[in-house]
């Protein structure tokens, strides 16, 4: 069942603001999101977060890195995943921060909804098995569950690669077609 919310925006977990203390490196600017929030999960744990916030900072810490010579920031951000698969130190610093951000988001979710499964999606599901398992382990490490939760909860990669959004949209469309037509009135 798809939970829509009053304004149709339920489940926008990427825009939940997360604690940044200990997540950002010394002198690292506060991450901003396209939605206008500062420090939400998407400002760190997304391709846009890499392009806009993480890569520019880490390139100042890894001077003369190949990614700094790419020219197009969007293209450079897309290349970070491949560098992570090769265990490049700059890319690993970025993915460690992303794992920490997702872990903190899952911790927040654990405290308000106590789910039995936490699914990890996005570009990481399209990486090598070794990198996927490393990233999943890092997210698990940064997710603080109570003992009772840790015993029963599962942290897993989304099945069928990154189709969760498409699946949810299809279910919502089907439910809308099957719902009785509501009478509308105008003033």
Give the residues covered by each predicted segment:
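Short, flexible helix/strand-to-coil boundary loops that buttress conserved ligand/catalytic motifs
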Residues: 6-7, 54
């Amino acid at each position: 069942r798809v939970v829509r919310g009053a304004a149709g925006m339920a489940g926008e977990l990427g825009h939940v603001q997360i604690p940044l203390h200990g997540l950002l490196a010394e002198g690292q600017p506060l991450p901003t999101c396209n939605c206008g929030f500062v420090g939400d999960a998407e400002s760190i744990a997304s391709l846009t977060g890499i392009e806009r916030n993480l890569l520019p900072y880490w390139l100042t810490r890894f001077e003369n890195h190949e990614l700094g010579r790419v020219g197009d920031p969007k293209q450079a951000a897309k290349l970070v995943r491949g560098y992570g698969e090769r265990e490049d130190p700059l890319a690993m610093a970025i993915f460690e921060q992303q794992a920490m951000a997702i872990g903190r988001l899952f911790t927040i979710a654990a405290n308000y909804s106590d789910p039995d499964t936490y699914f990890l999606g996005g570009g990481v599901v399209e990486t090598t098995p070794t990198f996927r398992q490393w990233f999943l382990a890092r997210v698990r490490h940064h997710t603080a569950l109570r003992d009772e939760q840790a015993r029963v909860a599962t942290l897993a990669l989304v099945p069928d690669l990154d189709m969760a959004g498409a699946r949810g949209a299809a279910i919502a469309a089907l439910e809308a077609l099957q719902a009785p037509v509501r009478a509308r009135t105008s003033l």
